Design a protein with these regions (language model features):
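Short, acidic, metal-binding catalytic loop of nucleotide-sugar glycosyltransferases
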Residues: 76-87
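The conserved acidic donor/metal-binding loop of glycosyltransferases
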Residues: 141-145, 239
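Active-site-adjacent substrate/metal-binding segments within catalytic domains
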Residues: 210, 551-638, 660, 668-669
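Active-site groove signature of glycoside hydrolases
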Residues: 668-706, 730-736
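Extracellular glycoside hydrolase catalytic/binding regions
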Residues: 704-800
């Protein structure tokens, strides 16, 4: 992580300043969250259940508010009464419901209500505390159904007089009710597993508000349950500030309901974010000096979870602004960026999977993708909670809806729809204005954000989609197939997760080692590549100076043409082609993955403008490539001609390069797609392959390779002419002493070639050789020295 942060904070990678610092804020925040998570994996502690040495009197409280389902509260009360440890049960009924009075009377439950309804849930519990006498007080949410042995692993921990409360796992029974329920549950798995277990070591175990057992004297010491929207965390803070200790028992002793609709989930998250921010602003400073140093960090960091709403917003804005303004937040080699990001990302995933040995149940293991996506879709709720805190706006304490019904949630989707629409508009505008690789990458990020928004919207409409699928057999069949696919994937996923947990440490060590290796030996690789290039240039010089056998005599015979024993100009001599053309080989953007800053359309248009000022009227562009759109659009706008070239690698298997997916097929598809561009003046087959083959082959093998190339080239030129008979087709040859003979051979074998492009990269070949070429020719590439000594003043068109 230090290597990652050091790399991205380097001054050399800074791009457009506002976007860069926005991105750095997002990166730093994410790294801090990861560090916080890792710190809660260091001391995973499962406390042993002490032997029971005495009996405690226990009061169990649950609540009811008007509108909550009767079936739910009756089920909970019945289960509470079935708990085997002796206790008294209290229903804190805010509605003073007559039906529930009868139920309580029948079950032997104390029915408690109040007339002064203050402090929401905390006030309701405190009212019941005032009329109860138990030494221990259990708070259960009305949707959480306890098991008969609920109290057995908890009670004995209170033999330690310093323990103020004991918290157990919040587990759920409706995880599979829908994507919202599944995602909301997944967000809790790591927290109630290894993270809360580590809080045992730090002395920072939180009271969660449900399934928590308090010592009455501890509550009395702080005046009862603390009030607020996050009353559970407030109570924890007050008790810890008083010096009370807490214990987390990682045991599933009750199961409740997780929000299953978007409105219920958003209400819960808004209540928590507003409540936690309020505690951070108004309570945390007052209690700060009374916390241990671990508790100071703990309660100071928890609100940062809800600050992630701003980070998500930044992540939405960066690609949008980048696409609209045509700027980049960072100037970094994509390979280098991958080398610094991927190892850290892999370590985060592997560590998270490794600690899943300590989650509660097997179904809680996994990537928790649904939970992560749902969290991203909650960005605006977190921001709203923060804004409400600053504005002092109060929101009513409303119990999380439990019925799973939702009529119309489109208004709740408006912020996500805005992000979706804005991102789509930015993608269309940005790529239309400047189709370069970096804009495509940014469009990819914006597209990912669109997917995040679409997921949350689709998840919120899942009930409506189910109704729709039942009305249409096709959708019903697709839904059935998807369910079967998920079942099969679940089996595969279990095996993958198990393997990752087992081998996580070894994989992580391997990744770190590979990162060090690539970083250490990259300079050696560059040196080896440089030496290889020098050897290649040496071989080229040998071929040009006739010190190496180019294989031409054998090739003449293989092609069925007579061998010229002496070189002479036959016919009228060189015929100038593209006369009046002053061109440039424009190769910017070819190695775009290792080029930064990004090659933008603005830079391209400025280059073309300067070219026109110096008299250049044509560029030679190699394609097809990512910059075709920009280059062809800009050259058309500025009335610049294009000599469209195709680079032919010499290592191509020309004997087998036929059919779909072949190089020739790609070239022909490009010609068909672009032949309507009027400012493309010709098609060029680039790279003097027939001569370069002599560097790596010799003898009969060389002859076979060269003959295969000629046959391939003949088929290709024929195909191009069939698609576009009006434009000339040219082919490159290296300018050497043998060039006139080679051109004669190629022109005889492939008469459809309209002209030959001379690649002139040295000054040793006499200029007279250029004049002796008995075919139409032009200069497709020339170095500066060769231009001054051999080409300047010649008749044919020139590309430098």
């Amino acid at each position: 992580m230090g290597f990652f942060l050091g790399s991205i904070f380097s001054a050399s990678v800074r791009g457009y300043a506002p976007l860069y610092w926005m991105l750095m804020a997002a990166f730093v925040f994410s790294c801090l969250k990861v560090v916080h998570e890792w710190c809660h994996y260091l001391f995973i502690t499962v406390p042993k259940t002490p032997p029971l040495t005495r009996r405690y009197t226990v009061d169990i409280f649950t609540t009811f508010c008007a509108g909550e389902p009767y079936e739910m509260i009756v089920e909970t009360l019945t289960a509470i009464q079935a708990i085997t440890y002796p206790h008294e049960t209290y229903l804190c009924d805010e509605a003073d419901d007559p039906y529930l009075r009868q139920v309580c009377s029948k079950l032997g439950v104390h029915h408690v209500t109040r007339t002064e309804k203050i402090n929401a849930k905390a006030g309701n519990i405190n009212n019941a505390l005032s009329i109860s006498k138990g030494e221990l007080c259990v708070v259960l949410d009305p949707d959480h159904v306890p098991f008969p042995d609920f109290l057995d692993p908890i009670i004995s921990h209170f033999d330690n007089p310093e323990i103020g409360y004991v918290q157990i796992v919040q587990a759920y029974k409706n995880n599979d009710e829908g994507l919202i329920a599944k995602g909301a549950a997944q967000q809790t798995y790591q927290f109630y597993g290894p993270m809360m277990m580590t809080m045992n070591k730090y002395g920072t175990v939180l009271a969660i508000g449900a399934n928590c057992t308090f010592r009455r004297t501890a509550l009395d010491s702080i005046g009862g349950h603390a009030a607020g929207l996050a009353e559970d965390m407030h109570t924890s803070m007050q008790l810890h500030a008083k010096g009370w200790k807490s214990v987390y028992v990682p045991a599933v002793l009750a199961r409740g309901l997780v929000p299953s609709t978007l409105s219920a989930y958003y209400k819960q998250q808004l209540k928590w974010s507003r409540g936690v921010f309020d505690l951070f602003v108004h309570v945390y400073p007052k209690l700060f000096s009374r916390f241990t140093w671990q508790q100071k960090l703990h309660y100071g960091v928890i609100p940062l979870h809800y600050m992630s709403g701003f980070i998500f917003l930044i992540n939405f804005l960066i690609p949008v602004i980048s696409l609209v303004l045509g700027v980049s937040p960072m100037h970094i080699d994509l390979t280098d960026f991958g080398l610094i990001v991927l190892p850290m990302a892999a370590c985060i995933i592997l560590i998270r999977h490794f600690v899943q040995w300590w989650v509660m149940e097997d179904e809680e293991r996994g990537f928790h993708v649904v939970g992560g996506l749902l969290l991203i879709g909650t960005w605006w709720i977190f921001i709203l909670g923060f804004v409400y805190t600053l504005a002092g706006k109060k929101i009513p304490y409303v119990p999380t809806p439990k019925d799973g019904n939702e009529a119309n949630n489109w208004p709740l989707n408006v912020p996500n729809l805005v992000v979706l629409g804005t991102s789509l508009a930015a993608i269309i505008y940005g790529l239309y204005q400047d189709l370069n690789p970096y804009n495509i990458i940014m469009a990819g990020f914006a597209g990912i954000n669109c997917f995040f928004m679409c997921f949350t919207i689709a998840a919120s409409r899942q009930q409506q989609l189910h109704v729709l699928s039942h009305k249409h057999p096709v959708l019903q069949s697709f839904s059935k197939w998807l369910k079967e696919l998920k079942g099969n994937f679940w089996i595969l996923r279990r095996r993958i997760y198990s393997g990752m947990r087992t081998a996580a440490f070894l994989i992580m060590v391997l990744l770190i080692s590979l990162t060090i290796y690539f970083g250490k030996f990259s300079s050696r690789t560059e040196k080896e590549e440089r030496l290889a290039r020098e050897n290649e240039l040496h071989m080229q010089r040998l071929v040009r100076n006739n010190s190496a056998d180019s294989g031409l005599p054998a090739l003449f015979r293989a092609a069925g043409h007579p061998v010229h024993t002496k070189r002479s100009a036959t016919g009228p001599g060189s015929i100038a082609f593209f006369a009046g053309t002053r061109g440039v080989n424009y190769t910017k953007g070819h190695n775009w993955a290792r080029r930064y800053p990004a090659f933008t359309r603005q830079e391209l248009e400025e280059d073309l403008r300067q070219m026109k000022q110096t008299g250049i009227n044509t560029i030679r562009h190699f394609g097809p490539g990512i910059y075709d759109y920009n280059i062809l659009k800009a050259t058309s706008t500025q009335s610049m001609n294009v000599h469209y070239a195709f680079w032919v690698p010499e290592d191509t298997d020309f004997a087998d390069d036929q059919g779909f997916g072949s190089l020739s097929d790609e070239i022909l598809e490009t010609v068909a797609a672009l032949k309507g561009k009027k400012h493309i003046v010709s098609w060029s087959i680039g790279n003097p392959v027939i001569q370069k083959l002599a560097k790596t082959h010799s003898g009969n093998e060389l002859t076979i390779k060269q003959k295969a190339y000629l046959d391939w080239l003949a088929r290709l030129v024929k195909g191009i002419k069939a698609l576009d008979p009006t434009r000339p087709v040219t082919a490159d040859v290296q300018f050497t002493l043998e060039t006139p003979d080679l051109v004669n051979l190629m022109h005889t074998h492939i008469p459809a070639i309209d002209a030959f492009g001379m690649v002139i990269s040295d000054t040793k070949t006499p200029k007279a050789i250029l004049d002796s070429i008995n075919a139409r020719s032009f200069i497709s590439y020339v170095t500066e020295d060769a231009w001054l000594q051999q080409v300047q003043g010649s008749g044919p068109g020139v590309f430098i």
